Every structure is written in C-alpha cells, then in structure tokens.
Curated annotation (Swiss-Prot):
MORN repeats: 8-30, 31-53, 54-75
Keyword Oxidoreductase: no
Protein name: MORN repeat-containing protein 5
Keywords: Cell projection, Cilium, Flagellum, Repeat
Coiled coil regions, renumbered to chain: none
Principal cellular location given in the protein's record: other
Pfam families linked to this entry: MORN
Annotated Gene Ontology cellular component terms: sperm flagellum
Gene3D superfamilies cross-referenced by the UniProt entry: Histone H3 K4-specific methyltransferase SET7/9 N-terminal domain (2.20.110.10)
Subcellular location: Cell projection, Cilium, Flagellum
Keyword Transferase applies: no
Signal peptide per UniProt: none
Length: 178
C-alpha cells in the first residue's frame, strides 16, 4: 500500500482492512469510515484536499447513496439546483455574506481569486495545463489526466490565466486635450 502512496490506519481482519479506519490515497483524499473485506463498506466520508466532502453509504466498495458538500459549505442538490444559474449568478459566499460594493465584485467564490499559472485554467480543485492535459492540485500534486470531454469542458467553462500582458494604458483625459 505504501509503495503506491496510499496509507491505512485502522482495524484489520485476516490481513485485510475491516472495521473502522482512515484510508488515504496518493491525491491526499481521505476516506474515514467503515471497511469490510478490504473495501469501503457501511457509512463513510471522503474528505477531499480542497476541503469538500462526500458522505455516503457504501456496499462492497460501491457508493449506494451520499451527499456532497463543497468546501464553502454549499450542499449539492441533484434537483432544484439554483446555485449560479441563469436567475442568480451570485457565489455561495455572496449569498451568505452579501454582495461587495460596486467596483469590488468577486471573480470567484474564494476571494481574492487564486493566481492561475500562465496558460492554465482553474478547475475548482486545481490547475489544468492544456499542453500536458494534466490537472494538478493547488499544492502542485498530480490529480488526474483530463480526457477529451473534460478538456473541452475546462477550456469552455473555466477561468484562464491572462495570455498576454496589456500593461498600463492611461486613458486620455478630455481636460488634457483642451
């Protein structure tokens, strides 16, 4: 297990994970809960590095039901989802704390927004480099390779770093021209 970058701290039975424990995978996602025959089985919570979590009920390693909560406390709903839709574009933190004054609008839910590396996109759980097609966590650790569908979604939907430096461009004042 350690050879693969995973670790487990918990109960064993016949050399297999069984009972309650904490299993950490190489991406630093942690499962805390019940195990049976080396698999997630029973109640458990997946804690993601970005602070979000998935609470579920598992059977033989397969999640049968669960609830996802984003790192800011927003709970995902499969139906009647009204977060950041066409009717209400506020971020969850703006819903909880109110809007900022004019001229100080938020670009992202985390405020101030993260600085995105050149040529990359902010995927919400890390940065995506379209040249390598790799998503790395905000800590720089590998998260995943993006398939064609995810690549297309990221390029169309996610916030991108600036491509070029525009520099300071003073506005001509009508008073100066007179």
């Amino acid at each position: 297990m350690e050879l693969m970058g995973s670790s487990y701290d918990g109960d064993y039975n016949n050399g297999r994970m069984e009972g309650t424990g904490e299993y950490t995978i190489p991406t630093h996602t942690r499962y805390v809960g019940e195990m049976k025959d080396g698999m997630f089985h029973g109640k458990g919570v997946l804690h993601f590095p970005n602070g979000s979590k998935y609470e579920g009920t598992w059977e033989k390693g397969i999640c049968k039901e669960g609830k996802y909560t984003f790192s800011d406390g927003l709970k995902y709903k499969e139906t009647d989802w009204d977060y950041c839709d066409g009717k209400d574009r506020r971020f969850y933190s703006e819903r909880c704390n109110g809007l900022k004054p004019a001229g100080e609008s938020q670009l992202t839910d985390p405020d101030p927004p993260r600085v995105i590396p050149d040529g990359c996109y902010d995927t919400g759980d890390g940065f995506y480099d379209p040249n390598t097609r790799v998503v790395k966590g905000y800590d720089g650790n590998f998260l995943r390779n993006a398939d064609d569908q995810e690549h297309e979604w990221i390029v169309l939907s996610c916030r991108k770093s600036l491509d070029e430096f525009t520099g300071y461009c003073p506005r001509a004042s009508t008073l100066e021209e007179k």
